[in-house]
């Protein structure tokens, strides 16, 4: 639909209709006056789902979460001034985690800037270098030349959400008065309405969707050190595969291709729990989940040194693993989907401009057969994992929160969306999430690793999702974004929040700063003492305290009457930090316990 009421409604309706024809399905709108033309065009379109959010920061993370799950850009709309500035944290996260996002900020016309016109800031390049493309639209004009310009700018903007990788596009949209569709202005554009041919104007516009996640982009010849296949890459040495968070997200085919590579080469796979691969265990791959513990044993760490490493995605989170890798002098090949530097260790890594699918196909076509030495190497990893698992299972009997996290994988329905908050929940998952075949999808905000927007991101993931969505979070992360509960009525879906409440920043309890007792509690642990039952009642959210594993297992299938429910697990961060330290110490001095 094109609205010829006035130049602003014309511009906004042409922009929205063009984006819709390109594939826009979801918008998140923050109320405000200067963005009125955009809001009205989106609300009246009929083909775009619109969520309204009072808080711009919460809105932006809601859009981020939805983009994470769908892989499609979400239009994020706000008015002028500091409203737009509140989008910045989510834009930074979207940039680093490669989530498509189309930001539309309403603005005053240039003549009203730098003269204290009110609610006016400099919004040009407001988000710095984080958008992969940004521009300011020209003021709306009532002519076909402007419509053509707007159509092509919208087309370019949509494509830039996907290319060269998934990311953020910012369109600053200045509007002059009148901002609303007033009928008295319609007559002045009647000639344009008669000239406008919708069939001709939108001819050739078709849905432009994302590339497959994990698909390699075309790179300049000299960008990567080696192309693929490369004569420098020899699959014969003892090899190891590292799998971490995938920039741009994952697909089932990507994960099964990784397993195919591992099976074809006979390489064991050290898989971060923040990658969904742990939930795709096929029983035929040496999938190693306890690596953080077992490489703490000096004898094991020495015995398991590989001759070659293939890294897919980012490095796993484990500090122990990263320290171990820093002591190893062997080639590390990184499959570089989007041309990023994925080596925080600054090692002598070799980037391969290839997709996982290309490597899997190459290995299959070459007919690789792992030799006896490689099979023994993989078996050694599996045997040490078995021994370490015995120690861990015994220790978990004395740990409330870690045990709950370890068992959560067996409680959730298959194909659950699990969003994991940063800080301690990420570590509990890394340490104790088991390999399984339930195909859970793991989501994280590991672009910038912040705790902001945790609840809102999870709600965006849950919105219009067909299955279960679960948020695993600590108390501070949930409190930091408690405004997200205001979007409950807008969310179409269900969200279960597993709240690990240890009354403070549990991650700091595991760091050296915990020894500074005079400042630790007040300035780092920052306990808030919030009654979450009361907080949930304020927002009309179901709340239940989970005291044991049986309680947790009984929560699925869920029958909650409200879109959101909170299952609170109360823990003691002091005891849990000491317990974890003791468990890690067992492996550091484990020669007497293991073979």
UniProtKB/Swiss-Prot annotation:
GO molecular-function terms, A-Z: 2-succinyl-5-enolpyruvyl-6-hydroxy-3-cyclohexene-1-carboxylic-acid synthase activity; magnesium ion binding; manganese ion binding; thiamine pyrophosphate binding
Disulfide bond positions: none
EC number(s) from the headed UniProt entry: 2.2.1.9
Catalysed reactions, semicolon-separated: isochorismate + 2-oxoglutarate + H(+) = 5-enolpyruvoyl-6-hydroxy-2-succinyl-cyclohex-3-ene-1-carboxylate + CO2
Pathway annotation from the record: Quinol/quinone metabolism; 1,4-dihydroxy-2-naphthoate biosynthesis; 1,4-dihydroxy-2-naphthoate from chorismate: step 2/7; Cofactor biosynthesis; phylloquinone biosynthesis
Cross-referenced InterPro entries: MenaQ_synth_MenD, MenD_middle, THDP-binding, Thiamin_PyroP_enz_TPP-bd_dom, TPP_enzyme_TPP-bd
Cofactor, free-text remark: Binds 1 thiamine pyrophosphate per subunit.
Cofactor: Mg(2+); Mn(2+); thiamine diphosphate
CDD domains assigned: TPP_PYR_MenD, TPP_SHCHC_synthase
Keywords: Magnesium, Manganese, Metal-binding, Thiamine pyrophosphate, Transferase
Assembly and interaction partners: Homodimer.
Matching PANTHER family: 2-SUCCINYL-5-ENOLPYRUVYL-6-HYDROXY-3-CYCLOHEXENE-1-CARBOXYLATE SYNTHASE, PROTEIN PHYLLO, CHLOROPLASTIC
NCBIfam families membership: menD (TIGR00173)
UniProt record similarity statement: Belongs to the TPP enzyme family. MenD subfamily.
Known role: Catalyzes the thiamine diphosphate-dependent decarboxylation of 2-oxoglutarate and the subsequent addition of the resulting succinic semialdehyde-thiamine pyrophosphate anion to isochorismate to yield 2-succinyl-5-enolpyruvyl-6-hydroxy-3-cyclohexene-1-carboxylate (SEPHCHC).
Name this polypeptide is given: 2-succinyl-5-enolpyruvyl-6-hydroxy-3-cyclohexene-1-carboxylate synthase
